Structure formats: structure tokens, C-alpha cells
Regions:
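P-loop NTPase catalytic core
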Residues: 1-162
Length: 162
């Protein structure tokens, strides 16, 4: 970046990085806090994330993609929770979506981008909001659709129109 170039930084995996930091911090005498993670783990991950992003005028940018390993799809797990609080957004990959054969298996309803509303036009943001609403409605009624319990009605016309 200091040479004025744009950089793509791929980090696999921030979970293993946090676990390694936990081990060294505990060996150094730090006391565990968040599910055995010392408080310095949040600081170290935040420092790593802050080094990426836009550079100063005339310098390059660093776009970062961090992978987070989540045991049993538990998004409340300490490292996943830390990352969600630090980064500008996250893309959740879903095993269930992959099993249905949809790739990339991105769970659109659980994924978040804090910068997208500023990057899209007002019309695009309306389309995105409407698409997410329709997808949420479909996800809500999909068990009834699979069980063939779907009936006609004003709400169901919205579903079939999606």
C-alpha cells in the first residue's frame, strides 16, 4: 500500500489466529475472560483489522477477507462475535443452502454489509431491501411449502409473486 498499490489481503483463519494468541497470552500470565480468551485478543484482532482499509491520499488500499471457522454454526461463539463487532460486514456461508445445491452458499439474510447502503443508489437500496424482505418471507413459509400446506390468500400472492 505504501507504494500506491491496492492490495487484497486473504487471512485464513482469524479463528486459528485468535486461538494461537490465546495460548501465548495465557502462557504470558494474562487471565482468561471471554470463554477463555484474554481481553487482549479483541485488541490484537482490532489492530489487525484497522491496518486494512483505505490508505491516505495517494496511497493504495488494502481490501481484507478474513475467514472465521465457526463450530457447529454457532455465531455467538467468541471469535465470530468479536469479528462481527469489529469488521464492516460479514458473509455467512450456509451448509443447508449448499445441500440444496445453491452456490455460492451465501445466507443473504444473515450476512451484513455496513458499507453497501453508501455504495448503492437509493433505487438499488430499495430493490435490495425488497428482495431481502421477499426472501425472509419465503424462508418463513418454506416449511409449509415443502409440507404442501400452502393455500391461497393475499399474503400468499406476495409469496408466489416472489
Amino acid at each position: 500500500r505504501d507504494q500506491g498499490r491496492n492490495v487484497l489481503f486473504l487471512f485464513d483463519s482469524i479463528t486459528r489466529f485468535a486461538e494461537a494468541h490465546r495460548e501465548t497470552a495465557l502462557l504470558a500470565g494474562e487471565t482468561p475472560a471471554l470463554n477463555a480468551f484474554p481481553p487482549s485478543t479483541v485488541r490484537v484482532i482490532a489492530e489487525l483489522a484497522e491496518r486494512t482499509g483505505p490508505g491516505t491520499e495517494g496511497k493504495g488500499d488494502i481490501t481484507a477477507i478474513y475467514s472465521v471457522l465457526v463450530a457447529g454454526s454457532d455465531m455467538e461463539e467468541p471469535v465470530a462475535d468479536m469479528i462481527r463487532g469489529i469488521l464492516d460486514g460479514h458473509i455467512i456461508l450456509s451448509r443447508e443452502i449448499a445441500e440444496r445445491g445453491r452456490y455460492p452458499a451465501i445466507d443473504i439474510l444473515r450476512s451484513v454489509s455496513h458499507s453497501l447502503p453508501h455504495a448503492a443508489s437509493d433505487d438499488e437500496n430499495v430493490l435490495i431491501r425488497d428482495a431481502r424482505r421477499m426472501l425472509a418471507l419465503y424462508e418463513e413459509v418454506s416449511p409449509m411449502l415443502r409440507a404442501n400446506l400452502y393455500g391461497s390468500g393475499p399474503r400468499n400472492r406476495t409469496i408466489s409473486g416472489a
